[in-house]
Structures are given as structure tokens and as C-alpha cells.
Amino acid sequence: MGDKKQFRGKNPYTDRREFKSKEIKKSLVHRARLRKNYFKLLEKEGINHEPEQNGDESAESQNKSEEFKRSHIPDSRNQPSKRPMNFAERAKIAKERKEHSRQAKLKSIQDRRETIEKKSKERERRKDNLSKKTKSGQPLMGPRINNLLDKIKKDIE
């Protein structure tokens, strides 16, 4: 009878996003507090060191910073000099791009329609061949066997 569960408040798992954000904040605060206490301890001992990174992490961060610098510094040897384009030139280029993309879309639509049409004609032809009957009403076996052979050939390919 004393086994009743006590009221604990809001279930932390009802809103998972809120729970996760609280958990992340809690871990960040905990790490910051640990770091602060660590530096206080170092200061008391008289050692003034900057926080050291692992060799791998520092090498990666250096590589990233060098790549960032290289990518954002314009290199006059690799790039031709760009003169500012006026409005008419930019409009012309934009129009050409739009026309090119429109042509590509039209071509893909036409190709798709052609393939659909070919497949439907092929289906219709097969249907006609398979529905042929003898004089006595029995189905013709030749087209059916050919159909099965074609299916087997497709599976092999």
C-alpha cells in the first residue's frame, strides 16, 4: 500500500527538443565551471599556461586556417582580371542561362514522352500477340513462349 509513486513534476521526455537543449546547456555550464576551477588551481600553483590542445587538433586547426587564408586571398595568376559588367551584359548572360536550362528541360520532357510512347506501343504489341487464339479458341503457344524467352533474356542482361 505504500508502493504509490510520488509526483515528480513534468516528465522531461515529453518535449524532447526542450530536454535536449537543457541537457546541452547543463553540460556546457559544467565544462565551463571545471575549466574555471582548473585555471584557478593553476594560478594558485603559479603556473600560467594557456589551454593546450592535442597535437592532432592544433595541426588540424592550423591546416584549416591556412586553407581558409589561401581560399580567400585572390590569386592574380590563376584568375583572369575581372572587369565589372554592366547591367546589359549581366542581363544577357542571365537570359542565356535561362534559355539553356529551358532547352534542357524541354529535351528531357521530350525524351521521357518518347520512351513512354515506345513502351506503351511495345505493351500493346505484346498484348495483341498474347491474345491470339486458334480456330478452336485455344491460345497460341508460340507468342507466349517467345514472351517468356524475352523475359529470361532481359533478366540475364
From Swiss-Prot:
| Claim: RNA-binding is one of the keywords in the record | no
An example Gene Ontology biological process: rRNA processing
Q: Where in the cell is it found?
A: Nucleus, Nucleolus
Cited Pfam families:
rRNA_processing
Instruction: Specify the superkingdom.
Output: Eukaryota
Composition bias (Basic and acidic residues) maps to 13-23, 63-75, 89-131
The record's listing under InterPro entries reads:
Fyv7/TAP26, Fyv7_fungi
Q: Where is this region: Disordered?
A: 1-23, 44-157
Coiled coil in keyword set:
yes
Where mainly located? nucleus
Q: Which residues form a coiled coil?
A: 106-135
What keywords does the record list, in alphabetical order? Coiled coil, Nucleus, rRNA processing
GO cellular component terms, A-Z: nucleolus
The protein's job, in short, is:
Involved in the processing of the 20S pre-rRNA.
Would you identify the family this protein belongs to, as annotated?
Belongs to the FYV7 family.
Mind telling me what this protein is named? rRNA-processing protein FYV7
